[in-house]
A protein has these predicted regions:
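Bacterial N-terminal signal peptides that target proteins for export
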Residues: 1-8
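The canonical Cys-X-X-Cys-His
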Residues: 154-165
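Bacterial signal peptide processing site
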Residues: 19-21, 159
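C-terminal motif of bacterial Sec signal peptides marking the signal peptidase cleavage site
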Residues: 15-17
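Extracytoplasmic c-type cytochrome modules immediately beyond a signal peptide or single-pass transmembrane anchor
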Residues: 23-153, 167-182
Length: 182
């Protein structure tokens, strides 16, 4: 019996190491903004947060709610497709789901760039995600007191941005302007 030659043992290992490298997946393109910040706010968090706030005074399945809660802003009358507690649950989820869109670079309505790279803005977006998750958990209980309690969480998450970037002196068109700390 012949003893194997070292080359015969090493060659297969060498050939295995000479394979072409695995292709690297291309990075996903950065999301593109199609709305300014005002349009985004009016399209998503405004109507959906109002659905949640509506539960402070109205039962989603009460007789006075004949129209869709989720799209009541648009007057989808006599529709129960998105009504009731399911509409409340969906609106809570919508807040969490859409919150990352607030990090996509875009302009404010006044043409200034939205402060999406600011640490406090990013923290407020995370706060909105958490508020939506908390509201969804409360909506699953179908308990109006739970919805009343979670409303403060939603308000606080919105105020984290509004107090600094929206509710400012508008005489100089300063919405979205990053102010230097005093």
């Amino acid at each position: 019996m012949k003893t194997p030659k070292p080359l015969a043992l090493i060659l297969p290992l060498f050939l295995l190491g000479c394979r072409a490298p695995e292709p690297v997946a291309a990075a996903a393109p950065a999301p593109k903004a199609h709305m300014n910040m005002l349009q985004l706010m009016r399209a998503f968090p405004f109507p959906h947060s109002n659905v949640l706030f509506d539960t402070q005074t109205r039962d989603p399945i009460g007789p006075e709610k004949k129209q869709s809660m989720t799209y009541s802003v648009y007057r989808w009358q006599d529709s129960d497709t998105y009504a009731g507690w399911e509409g409340v649950e969906n609106s809570a989820l919508a807040l969490s789901e859409m919150a990352p869109l607030l990090l996509v670079p875009r302009t404010c309505a006044n043409g200034l760039p939205a402060p999406v790279d600011q640490a406090d803005w990013k923290a407020a977006v995370e706060g909105l995600v958490g508020a939506g998750e908390a509201a969804h958990k409360a909506a699953l209980t179908k308990n109006l007191d739970e919805m009343l309690n979670v409303s403060e969480t939603v308000v606080n998450s919105c105020s984290a941005c509004h107090d600094k970037y929206r509710d400012v002196d508008l005489s100089g068109g300063t919405r979205c302007e990053v102010k230097a700390k005093k």
